[in-house]
A protein has these predicted regions:
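Alpha/beta-hydrolase fold catalytic core
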Residues: 1-35, 56-64, 100-104, 139, ...
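Active-site loop/oxyanion-hole signature of alpha/beta-hydrolase fold enzymes
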Residues: 15-18, 29, 56, 64-109, ...
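Conserved HGGG/HGGXW glycine-rich cap/lid loop of the alpha/beta-hydrolase fold
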Residues: 24-78
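Conserved hydrolase catalytic core segment
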Residues: 103-148
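A catalytic-pocket lid/entrance helix-loop region that shapes and gates access to the active site
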Residues: 135-170
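Alpha/beta-hydrolase
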Residues: 169-258
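Conserved loop-alpha-helix segment in the C-terminal half of the alpha/beta-hydrolase fold
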Residues: 240-287
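Catalytic active-site module of serine/aspartate enzymes centered on a nucleophile-bearing elbow/loop
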Residues: 274-308
Length: 308
């Protein structure tokens, strides 16, 4: 099994009626910018371990690194809701940054969902972010008002499916089954890292009949579609308000094209990035959407010089 090189501690931070689980490497150092890492959809803060381990000693020593489990993921408590709203992630992040760095801005890195949140947060709270890195946080395809009736209907239908139990996440007989699932989703993930991730991505639970199965640490309600259409005009205005130097990183596999199949393309995403006042792009080679798992050394090598 993979052996973590830099061991974090677990902290629980009260945020908006939730106990937020946060993995923390190092201590706060006056004058040193904290680094905040936020994960993507159906993931956990532990996913960043491989990148943290790949950072050089010169960079990591004396810098506090913070990686929360978003609400409804990992060890962060479920909010007691049956669907999730993107603005809640921004507010949670705002409280989290205030807790760990009340007096100075932070460096913020987000992957996928976390990258989208990071971009929106950086444009909404520009004074709180020193430098920003977005890993594959592409946003969503543009929408039209005519889609609204169908979107609301789909949202209500999916809520009913959730409450019927139709959207429950699959459970596994053991941690090995969880690891196999991770490798099926990402064929580049090696066995040792999959085995290590499995213990943080899921947990064993014993049912009333005495049977124990491993359950994914993610709320099934995350599968519910957002009731509101993606408002591209609003997003681009927020991008224009980002003051932090920004690095947009994508994987060589073009996961955006593979997922949306022409409905939304890398070329469109690159056009959107032109709205960010100070933005540059980089590509991680031989990597897919989970590029921080596939090539942690490449990701770390991009992060370090940009965040110095």
């Amino acid at each position: 099994m993979y052996q973590a090189q830099r061991l974090p501690r677990s902290e629980f931070v009260p945020i908006r009626h939730l106990q937020y689980h946060v993995r923390v490497w190092g201590e706060a150092v006056p004058g040193q910018t904290p680094l905040v890492l936020v994960h993507g959809w159906m993931d956990v803060g532990a996913s960043w371990q491989f990148v943290v381990d790949a950072l050089s000693g010169a960079f990591a020593t004396g810098r506090q690194i913070i990686a929360p489990d978003w609400r409804g993921y990992g060890k962060t408590a479920l909010p007691g809701a049956d669907n999730y709203w993107l603005p809640d992630y921004l507010a949670d992040l705002d409280f989290l940054i205030d807790h760990y760095s009340p007096e100075q801005p932070v460096d913020l890195v987000g992957h996928s969902l976390g990258g989208n949140v990071a971009m929106l947060y950086a444009g909404s709270r520009p004074a709180r972010i020193r430098r920003l890195i977005n890993l594959e946080g592409f946003g969503m395809p543009a929408t039209k008002p005519a889609q609204a009736p169908g979107r609301y209907a789909k949202w209500m239908d999916e809520l009913k499916s959730l409450h019927r139990g139709d959207l429950q996440l699959h459970s596994y007989a053991d941690a090995t089954g969880v690891a196999r699932r991770l490798m099926k989703t990402n064929p580049r993930l090696p066995q040792d890292k999959a085995d290590w991730l499995a213990q943080f991505w899921a947990e064993p639970r014993t049912a009333a009949d005495g049977a124990t199965r491993w359950h994914i640490l993610g709320d099934a309600a995350h599968k519910i579609i957002n009731a509101n259409l993606y408002q591209l005009d609003e997003v681009l205005e927020i991008y224009r308000s980002i003051s932090a130097p920004t690095l947009a990183v994508e994987a060589s596999d073009d996961s955006l094209g593979l997922w949306w199949k022409g409905r939304y393309t890398l070329a469109e995403y690159h056009e959107r990035l032109k709205c960010v006042p100070d933005c540059r792009r980089a590509v991680v080679q031989d990597a897919g959407h989970m590029l921080h798992h596939d090539q942690p050394a490449q990701v770390a090598a991009l992060l370090e010089p940009f965040l110095i």
